[in-house]
């Protein structure tokens, strides 16, 4: 019997699920390995339990917390899927400001309506036990397929343990620091095929920190290129990465 897979969305843009919906022929191949029983963007079905639950989005309300805990109870394996689920994502930017001020700015006179109640954003693993993560904003489709196949076969999923800079070297990219741009590639986990630096856009850390980031190397690169820590600290906040990685 094929493992039963469900996709669930919380506070997010649902772009990671769109990445999977756009797999087209490849998702048909995935369906040969797993039984997709719940995926709101693709089908109307639902299920009572799951072998693998993929959670997209951060937790920002009491109702989110209750729902993700319920999904956890009904799932053998729970995977946080995409930067919002994995890190808290851009939604965690609101945690840097007064909550009432943020709600007034976004919702105006309706800021205190009960259905708009919210609390400080949390990543999924900050609320429930998580068995695996698929990082990125959006997720890398090839990596998604690889990890889901591994989980379906009972194998531990593997993420790259080296930084984005390695992938830039493989692609013969000119280092963005050499053209005067700040970039978080030296401390960000690879696996995206260096897609942003390849298109002359700085890595902003959407995949989270590489294990044991080389802080000294990062500081040396910044100093060599005359880039301030303040500028880089602002980049760290985009995906809720702790800037204390560079104390």
PLM regions: where:
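Iron-sulfur (Fe-S) cluster-binding modules
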Residues: 1-54, 59, 63-78, 98-247
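Short gly/pro/ser/thr-enriched loop/turn and capping motifs at secondary-structure boundaries
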Residues: 84-89
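Portal/gating segments that form or line small-molecule/metal binding sites
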Residues: 94
């Amino acid at each position: 019997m094929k493992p039963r897979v469900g996709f669930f969305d919380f506070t997010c843009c649902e772009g990671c699920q769109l990445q999977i919906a756009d797999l087209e022929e490849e998702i048909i191949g995935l369906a040969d390995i797993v039984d997709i029983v719940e995926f709101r963007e693709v089908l109307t079905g639902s299920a009572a339990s799951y072998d693998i639950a993929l959670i997209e989005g951060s937790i920002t309300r009491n109702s989110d917390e209750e729902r993700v805990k319920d999904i956890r109870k009904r799932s053998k394996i729970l995977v946080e899927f995409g930067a919002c689920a994995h890190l808290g994502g851009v939604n965690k930017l609101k945690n840097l400001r007064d909550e009432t001020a943020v709600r007034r700015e976004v919702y105006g006179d309706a800021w205190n309506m009960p259905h708009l109640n919210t609390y400080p954003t949390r990543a999924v693993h900050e609320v429930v036990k998580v068995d695996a993560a698929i990082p990125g904003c959006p997720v890398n489709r090839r990596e998604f397929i690889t990890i889901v196949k591994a989980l379906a076969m009972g194998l531990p999923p593997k993420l790259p343990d080296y930084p984005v800079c390695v992938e830039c070297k493989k692609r013969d990219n000119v280092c963005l620091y050499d053209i005067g741009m700040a970039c978080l590639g030296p401390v960000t986990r690879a696996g995206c095929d260096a897609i942003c630096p390849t298109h002359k856009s700085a890595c902003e850390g959407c995949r989270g920190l590489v294990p044991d980031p080389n802080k000294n190397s990062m500081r040396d690169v910044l100093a060599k290129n005359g880039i301030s820590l303040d500028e880089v600290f602002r980049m760290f906040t985009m995906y809720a990465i702790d800037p204390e990685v560079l104390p």
